[in-house]
Each structure stands twice: as structure tokens, then as C-alpha cells.
Amino acid sequence: MGQKVNPISNRLGIIRGWDSNWYGGNDYGDSLLEDSKIRKYLNARLAKASVSRIVIERTLKLVTITVCTARPGIIIGKGGQEVDKLKEELKKVTDKDIQINIFEVKRPELDAVIVANNIARQVEGKIAYRRAIKMAIANTMRMGAEGIKIQISGRLNGAEMARSEMYKEGRTPLHTFRADIDYCHAEALTKVGLLGIKVWICRGEVFGKRELAPNFTQSKESGRGNNGGNNGGGKNFKRKKNNR
């Protein structure tokens, strides 16, 4: 069933941590709905900032939001003006104090969310989907990934009948729980309808115990940080060389 299930949810509690870190009581449903609203708002508001992951932590009176992005300067703005503005906007959504941390993804080519969204934007910009996919595969493998698999589905090239095409290079062992597999599904809106884009990236294998809680080690409301566990840079991370 490793081929069917979402690779991220399949590894929760093993080598992958949760994106919402808090304990809920009777208000669990309200907090969950609030998290959904925050993520939906941020993904729409920061569509051009190459956002990879949004981690939400809660205390009684404070909501801490960590945004992982490949373009932190867009979110921070000049002198932090954009962050302050974003904080005020989110206060209206949650009615609680907001703290925003910015974490820079230093190798966006190894992040499935960023890769999938980049392909989708290129396809919407009328770039040939095969060219966009092959460029993404080449860039990802050049950055040291063990393997990548990309599937695109829909009315490709305006065909009357929808079909799926898959492109892959290297290895993506979905049944191996210690394999660090990143996954994302994105959509591209074209004149002939929606195209679905799925991306799997194997960043190596994790040996030994891995800290499941997000390890964002940069200062608050800054755009600099270590590579962390989000894009394959944890201290227990090892790579195997592929002879291609």
C-alpha cells in the first residue's frame, strides 16, 4: 500500500513530525478549523513567496506560526514591515496574539511542494509540460537527490481524452519507512481544464533516532536559518550514492 498512501502521512511518528503542535481540550474542533483558516489564508497571501510548509504551535494566549519559504525577503519586507502587516491580518482571523517565524529553505530543488508549484505555474504560463518536468528533474538530481518521480494527469496538450504521464529518475522506495520521501500534489489551471501534478522526491535514508519536532533554529521573525529537517539537512541524515 506504499504506492497508494500519502508518503508524508505514512511516515508520521517515524521520521516525519506534525505540522500542528498543540494539545486541545473541548475547543479542539475550533482550533483545528482555525489552523485550516490560517493555512488557507497564508497560502493565498504568500502565493509568490514559494512557501513550503506552515507549522503552527499553540499556547493558551499565543499562536506561533513558522513559515518555511525559499524567498524569505518577500515575506519579511523592508525593515520587517510586511511581517508586521501580516501579523495584524492574522490577528483578525484568530483573535489571539500572533508570533511569526520565517525559516529559509536553502535547497528548494529538494522540496516537493516548491517543485510541484513551480511546474504548475510554468504550465499555466504556457510552457510545454514536458520541458518543465525535465528541467525540474535535472535540477533536483543535480542538488543530490537519490530519486524523483513526477506524474501529470489531465487533458495534456488539449487532448479530448484525459491521460496520465509519469517521468522518473533514480529511486523512490515508497515502502521503505526510513527513506526520506517528500511529496506534494499541485494543480495547474489551463484553458482546457485542471491538470494534476504529483511529485515524489527521495532525499536519502534516515538512520538512527530522528527528532520529530520541527527544529527551526533561526531567530524569531528572521529570514535566515539552518537547513533543518524540512529539506533533508538533519544531523542523522545520510545519503547513499547512486551510480547512474
From Swiss-Prot:
Matching SUPFAM superfamilies: Prokaryotic type KH domain (KH-domain type II), Ribosomal protein S3 C-terminal domain
Cellular component, GO annotation: cytosolic small ribosomal subunit
Record-level Gene Ontology MF annotations: mRNA binding; rRNA binding; structural constituent of ribosome
Pfam families for this protein: KH_2, Ribosomal_S3_C
Alphabetical GO biological process terms: translation
Domain KH type-2 span(s) in chain numbering: 38-106
Compositional bias (Gly residues): 225-235
Residue ranges, annotated region (Disordered): 217-244
Domain of life: Bacteria
Keyword check for Cell membrane: no
rRNA-binding in keyword set: yes
Alphabetized UniProt keyword annotations: Ribonucleoprotein, Ribosomal protein, RNA-binding, rRNA-binding
Subunit structure comment from the entry: Part of the 30S ribosomal subunit. Forms a tight complex with proteins S10 and S14.
Record function comment: Binds the lower part of the 30S subunit head. Binds mRNA in the 70S ribosome, positioning it for translation.
Family according to the record: Belongs to the universal ribosomal protein uS3 family.
Full protein name: Small ribosomal subunit protein uS3
Lineage of origin: Bacteria, Pseudomonadati, Bacteroidota, Bacteroidia, Bacteroidales
Gene this chain is encoded by: rpsC
